[in-house]
């Protein structure tokens, strides 16, 4: 398994690579599995969905997710948890 940074991913797509690196939550890592059956548009779609991934904050009392820390704080200030 090799670790790629985002520059390497961009370079792969610029060269028209059809193998798609599989990312993990802790970092971007490359899976050595054969992804030769993926077309270039499919690979680009997977790459774009990776870019759209957002961080979120969770209220541990009610398990709700928020897109900003400010929204989480507002929730904690306004909602009474049992």
Swiss-Prot record:
It comes from the Eukaryota. A zinc finger (C2H2-type) spans 57-81. Its main location: secreted. Residues 1-19 form the signal peptide. GO terms for cellular component: extracellular region; host cell nucleus. Keywords: Host nucleus, Metal-binding, Secreted, Signal, Transcription, Transcription regulation, Virulence, Zinc, Zinc-finger. It holds the Pfam family zf-C2H2_jaz. The keyword Zinc applies. GO terms for molecular function: zinc ion binding. The keyword Metal-binding applies. It is found in: Secreted; Host nucleus. Probable secreted effector that translocates into the nuclei of host cells to reprogram the expression of targeted genes by binding on effector binding elements in rice. This is Host transcription reprogramming factor 10. It comes from Pyricularia oryzae (strain 70-15 / ATCC MYA-4617 / FGSC 8958).
